[in-house]
C-alpha cells in the first residue's frame, strides 16, 4: 500500500503490466472482484472509499492520504479500516472508489456477455485479445457455448427512448458510441421469461436476491462493438459509487485519468 495508483493505462497495457511480473501474476479477474464484493455484502462490511475527491461521499469525515498537488487519487490502502472489504486492515483495500479498475475475463461483444471461464484468465499464457477463441457466451441455464450461438444472454437497452439496462437473449435496441444504457445495479432485471443463472450473479452482472446492502452503485453499458469492464467506481462517482458499480462502455484501447488496474497473484 501507500502508492499512487497508476492511471492512463488501457486494457491490453494493464494485462501486459501484470504478466511482466512473472508466473502467477495476472490482471485481477472479474469474478474475484465480484466475489470480494459479495463477501463484503454477506459480512455487512461493504467498503467505503475515495468516491468524492479524496473522501467517502457518504462518510465525508473519512479521508485517504493525498500527496501534495494531487486532487483526485488517494494513496492505496491509506483510508480507514472501513475502506477495506472486511472493514479491517487485513483485507483488500480500495475496491470502492479511487480509480475504476480494468478486470480480466469478461467482455461484451455487440451486447453478448462473454467470459473466459474456469479461471483461465489468471494464466500467464491466457489470450484475452479481441480475436481469442477462449471467449465463451452464456445461456440462461448457465451453459457455456460458442459466441454467436442463438439465445445467449445479452445486455439490452429497453428502447430508443428508455435507456434502462436489462438482461435479454437478444438485442432489441443497440447503443451507439455517443449513448449507453444503465440502471442502478440492485434494480437490474431480466426481460420476462429470461432465466438468470447463478453465474451472472457470481460475475457481478446481476444482483444477488439475498443481499440487502446494495447502495446506488450504477451499472452502465454499451451493446455495440467490443466493451471491456471497469469496476468499483472512482473518486468522482459520488452518489453512483460503490463496489458493485460496473462500466462496460469502453473499448480495450481506451485510457484516461479515471481508470487503473489491480494485479493479483495465484499459485
Show which residues each predicted segment covers.
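Short aromatic-cysteine micro-motif
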Residues: 1-95, 125
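Disulfide-stabilized, aromatic/cysteine-rich ligand-recognition loop
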Residues: 5-16, 23-24, 28, 109, ...
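Active-site loop architecture of trypsin-fold serine endopeptidases
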Residues: 115
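Generic structural signal for well-ordered beta-strand positions
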Residues: 100-101
Amino acid at each position: 500500500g501507500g502508492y499512487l495508483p497508476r492511471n492512463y493505462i488501457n486494457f491490453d497495457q494493464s494485462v501486459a503490466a501484470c504478466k511482466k511480473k512473472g508466473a502467477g501474476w495476472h490482471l485481477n479477474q472479474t469474478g474475484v472482484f465480484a466475489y470480494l464484493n459479495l463477501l463484503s455484502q454477506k459480512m455487512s462490511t461493504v467498503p467505503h472509499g475515495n468516491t468524492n475527491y479524496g473522501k467517502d461521499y457518504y462518510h465525508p469525515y473519512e479521508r485517504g492520504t493525498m500527496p501534495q498537488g494531487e486532487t483526485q487519487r488517494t494513496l492505496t490502502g491509506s483510508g480507514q479500516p472501513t475502506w477495506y472489504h472486511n472493514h479491517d486492515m487485513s483485507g483488500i483495500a480500495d475496491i470502492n472508489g479511487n480509480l475504476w479498475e480494468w478486470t480480466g475475463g469478461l467482455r461484451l461483444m455487440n451486447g453478448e456477455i462473454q467470459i473466459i471461464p474456469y479461471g483461465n484468465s489468471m494464466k500467464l499464457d491466457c489470450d484475452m485479445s479481441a480475436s481469442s477463441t477462449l471467449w465463451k457466451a452464456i445461456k440462461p441455464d448457465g451453459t457455456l457455448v460458442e459466441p454467436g450461438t442463438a439465445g445467449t444472454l445479452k445486455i439490452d437497452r429497453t428502447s430508443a427512448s428508455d435507456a434502462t439496462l436489462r438482461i435479454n437473449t437478444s438485442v432489441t435496441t443497440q447503443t451507439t458510441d455517443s449513448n449507453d444504457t444503465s440502471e442502478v445495479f440492485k434494480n437490474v432485471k431480466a426481460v420476462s421469461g429470461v432465466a438468470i443463472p447463478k453465474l451472472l450473479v457470481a460475475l457481478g452482472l446481476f444482483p444477488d436476491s439475498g443481499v440487502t446492502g446494495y447502495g446506488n452503485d450504477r451499472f452502465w453499458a454499451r451493446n455495440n462493438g467490443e466493451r471491456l469492464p471497469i469496476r468499483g467506481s472512482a473518486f468522482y462517482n459520488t452518489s453512483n459509487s460503490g463496489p458493485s458499480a460496473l462500466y462496460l462502455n469502453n473499448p480495450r484501447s481506451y485510457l484516461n485519468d479515471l481508470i487503473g488496474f489491480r494485479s493479483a497473484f495465484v499459485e
